[in-house]
Amino acid sequence: MSEAQGFDALASLSSNPEAAAPAVQKIDAQGRAYATGKRKNAIARVWIKPGKGSITINGRDQEVYFARPVLRMMIAQPLQVTDREGQFDIVVTVEGSGLSGQAGAVRHGLSKALTYYEPGLRAALKPHGFLTRDSRVVERKKYGKAKARRSFQFSKR
């Protein structure tokens, strides 16, 4: 085999990573798919299984835990994109950060759990960015500054 053929084979492998890894369901003994999602300092652990569509977050219903409709809409986005609303019972434990960060973490975890349960859904979720970890976190405070970037008030005289 010549060098050119070897490089062509390597190029085809690296350009299409999805072809190298076959899609396999990741389901536990109870028939659930599990995934973790993260956003800011929030970490969500998500379990999904076929059911009537109930969403339980930290032992409470989603309407109670996330009172703002915008946050509930954020969580439902992966289900709407994949047309799986009302088909899965979802149990979530989430901690850290605020409500907005927690909702983002739940959305990330739910998207990953859906792809573990049905690997074919990855193509629908990936373009919307639901499988990508949002790496933006709060910038740290620096010494000699009031906040991360804000300086103390300057007095000329």
Swiss-Prot record:
Pfam family of the protein (one): Ribosomal_S9
Family per record: Belongs to the universal ribosomal protein uS9 family.
GO CC, alphabetical: cytosolic small ribosomal subunit
High-level lineage: Bacteria, Pseudomonadati, Pseudomonadota, Alphaproteobacteria, Caulobacterales
GO biological process: translation
Keywords: Ribonucleoprotein, Ribosomal protein
NCBIfam families to which the protein is assigned, alphabetical: PRK00132.1 (NF001099)
Name of the protein in question: Small ribosomal subunit protein uS9
Record GO terms (molecular function): RNA binding; structural constituent of ribosome
